[in-house]
Amino acid sequence: MTNKNAYAQSGVDVEAGYEVVERIKKHVARTERAGVMGALGGFGGMFDLSKTGVKEPVLISGTDGVGTKLMLAIKYDKHDTIGQDCVAMCVNDIIAAGAEPLYFLDYVATGKNEPAKLEQVVAGVAEGCVQAGAALIGGETAEMPGMYGEDDYDLAGFAVGVAEKSQIIDGSKVAEGDVLLGLASSGIHSNGYSLVRRVFADYTGEEVLPELEGKKLKEVLLEPTRIYVKAVLPLIKEELVNGIAHITGGGFIENVPRMFADDLAAEIEESKVPVLPIFKALEKYGEIKHEEMFEIFNMGVGLMLAVSPENVGRVKELLDEPVYEIGRIVKKENESVIIK
């Protein structure tokens, strides 16, 4: 083993790493926004906070991945939307606290650096950043032979946003009588996929199940997570929202109570929840108890807002999309979430 080839013979292709950087530059350029300083490739990404115009800035950060949805992206060899999932999981969390996303960083670890595939992944990250209004200011691609199989990779992201101190959403303003408004999800989003994969383990993905309205199973399973930033930011700026819950792992039961105090509860009318076909299919083919579905999945509502009754009309006007009045905030007696 010569010194020149030593690293390559251990499974790390440095030249492929350089190629990835060149391939992703055009995608990163799409995410440029006011405040970005420096260029791709520095030791640290820089952002000038003064460019936001926020008077009393509070930085709010979030980090997440996409779980085993990645395994389906690998199985179906479709890698161009999984990056959007990663961005969505992070920015939807920080928008729930009232933050406007400013910038994003990604981390990809793989067993074998395949530049064309990794370009697709980062292109998806960039698309997510564009939808969120966040700049992609840095990242890391780690080739780790022996840690991962050659076809395997993992993806994580980190979002940083800013909120006006007076506009932080921390649940303290949520009150009895507030109306719960649901914003539609695009599908399963990015949680519950260990169960999803078990339910559909014997399917190729090419199937068109009767519940899925003409779509192939793999298309529905890989539908990218909706990013709610541009829909919800105007509501935050006008201080129309008292609480926001991002419905991810743990479904309604775990996530809705995170947006209000311990002495309150959410009373939800199940008949008003816009349940998507994929959830009906999962319940049927997976033989999952109906009540458990609400403990795992978003069931068609990816983001839930708590809004004072007098502000509901203005919120609907600004959203300009179907908005579902699915319940109210009540005084807590026993459970934090009551589904009727």
From Swiss-Prot:
Annotated PANTHER family: TRIFUNCTIONAL PURINE BIOSYNTHETIC PROTEIN ADENOSINE-3, TRIFUNCTIONAL PURINE BIOSYNTHETIC PROTEIN ADENOSINE-3-RELATED
Q: Cite the annotated pathway.
A: Purine metabolism; IMP biosynthesis via de novo pathway; 5-amino-1-(5-phospho-D-ribosyl)imidazole from N(2)-formyl-N(1)-(5-phospho-D-ribosyl)glycinamide: step 2/2
Q: Where in the cell is it found?
A: Cytoplasm
Catalysed reaction, written as an equation: 2-formamido-N(1)-(5-O-phospho-beta-D-ribosyl)acetamidine + ATP = 5-amino-1-(5-phospho-beta-D-ribosyl)imidazole + ADP + phosphate + H(+)
Record the organism: Streptococcus gordonii (strain Challis / ATCC 35105 / BCRC 15272 / CH1 / DL1 / V288)
One GO molecular function term of this record is: phosphoribosylamine-glycine ligase activity
- Name this protein carries in UniProt: Phosphoribosylformylglycinamidine cyclo-ligase
Gene Ontology biological process: 'de novo' IMP biosynthetic process; adenine biosynthetic process
Q: What gene is this protein translated from?
A: purM
The record ties this protein, via Pfam families, to: AIRS (PF00586), AIRS_C (PF02769)
